[in-house]
Amino acid sequence: MSTTNEETQANASKDYSEDALKMSYAAQPLDIMRALKLIEYYESKDDYDNSRKLYAELHERFPLYSPLWTMHLQSELQRNEFDTVEKLLAQCLAGDLENNDLSLWSTYLDYVRRKNNLITGGQEARAVVIKAFKLVMDKCATFEPKASSFWNDYLGFLHQWKPMNKWEEQQRLDMIREVYKKMLCVPFDKLEKMWNQYTLWEQETNTLTARKFIGELSADYMKARSIYQELLNVTANIRRTSPLNLRTANKNNIPQYVLPCKKNDHTQLEAWLKWIAWEKENKLELTEDALKDRVTYVYKQAIQQLLFEPEIWYDYVMYEFDNDAARKNILKVALQANPTSPTLTFKLAECYEVENKSEEVQNCFEKTIDELLRQYKNDNGNDELSSDIIWERKTLTYIYCIYMNTMKRLSGLSAARAVFGKCRKLKKAMTHDIYVENAYLEFQNQNDHKTASKVLELGLKYFGDDGEYINKYMDFLSLLNRGSQMKTLFETSIEKVEDLRQLKKIYVKMIGYESKYGNLNNVYQLEKRFFEKFPDTDLIQLFSTRYKIQDDNKIKNLELTYKLPDIISSDGDPSGVDKSFKKRQIENDENLPDSKRQKSQPLLPKEILDILAVLPKKQYFKNAFLDPSNLVNYLNEQVKLADEEN
């Protein structure tokens, strides 16, 4: 059924109205695409004041995300707003938060060339443009492996220069040679083509000096070419996509904010970290300062693609900055893009803590908590976002736990108790961990088991049916040797806990405690109740677990030799299979002679064995047609299996 034109227009108007776009962006201010759609709407209405305000808001939140600056600058350049462009360039290309991106620098070059017309400005204008090219070359182009377009533009500009006299001609030739010299010593795309272009140019310029100049540069070129091939392999899996302008921006080339619990693909993060590690090896044998500039450039490029990955920000901060003042500036920027990140929050709090700035430490934690609470309140009650809510509750609790411990360290127990007081008001927005953490904090710092026990008793009001909480409570009572309280907790909890995995652990814990510190009749009674609840559990498994010492099942180690799976695994493996059993079995198989190992379990899949069985024997081939090591490297580095892609 087709819709009428009126219906289509009404739907479009509804979907793209200013209010709808504003509400969409306000609901998720980390979604850059929502902001760009609103900017696109403003510009379609020639409402450039509002588009500028929104761009300014984005620059404030994401000052190191270069594509936003590039899109904004291009929009202003199209309308010849040179004063605005100049102010924007000063903001993004200088200062503590300077960007370093070739597309952004290319926009700067466009501005310089438009402002300095060679026809009207003559030699003075040319000098300004050449100075701008040199700046971009030193700041950015020598580090960028995809810089061939810049080098072509630079050389093209110099080749178009029509000298007025011999002195100018010689100056032009020297400049061209200097550019080639800089360019051919660094790894970048089309390096080989540029070398051929250079040798031809030298021969056309002066056949007498060509061999000398080419010879001087040859070794550096060969080294750069070799390193570029290596760099290609290192960066093969890296996806570098950025919008050319506002119209081409979409979800495929703009970073998307996703909660960590929904991040399934970390291949890009791993690929970028691999490139950074390779750069740090200094294959180009640069000076310490030059190496740092090059690695910093790659970090800033990684941020363009991994804006919402806290790890890349943390790595960058720890590499680039040696003092806490500089680190704080970048960590603040990182937290604006990742406002719920525990890693970045804790690191920034540390920077303030070493300066004994209690108020700044509190502000740091409170900002992260406020953002988590905002997200939690937005998502709470939506069944489709249940995994988000679980993550938000766990992260919120974790932040509060570290906040509480930090304030104890910084300002004493009363400050920590004040933080815990705030947590109690949040009730079900928190997990049980805050009560457990506070109980241990009270006990460790005051040796006060009464207050700690009261805290855990209070937690039962909210988590009385939480098997994990009951288990942790029992551990604490066991530590204090409060057997009677432990039994009371056990009896009042076993009917409330619905999670059978946790319930089984509660029973086993109580049986183990009675076995060590109680009496055997109580153990037998507990075992009877246990087997009524879990009739499929192997008798000897429970028996051997009961005789653990220092949490080590010696019966299995010394007598059962891991032939029986541990149904009541101490590590909480839902399968019940002892992971150490699996690990040792693999290790034992690897230590067997080849003949025995093949009989017990083939190392190769059946399909591979079938192929090997029909291949001709090696004695039929006099020469090697295939290098197996190269084939393995090729398969590892270049071939993606279907399962890996999914």
Curated annotation (Swiss-Prot):
Ordered alphabetically, the record's keywords are: Cytoplasm, mRNA processing, Nucleus, Repeat
SUPFAM superfamilies named in the record: TPR-like
- A Pfam family per the record: Suf
Naming one, the record's GO cellular component terms include: cytosol
Q: Where are the HAT repeats?
A: 46-78, 80-114, 128-160, 171-204, 249-281, 290-322
| Cross-referenced Gene3D superfamilies | 1.25.40.1040, 6.10.250.1660
Localization in the cell: Nucleus; Cytoplasm
Descriptive protein name: mRNA 3'-end-processing protein RNA14
- Which taxonomic lineage is given here? Eukaryota, Fungi, Dikarya, Ascomycota, Saccharomycotina
Q: State the encoding gene.
A: RNA14
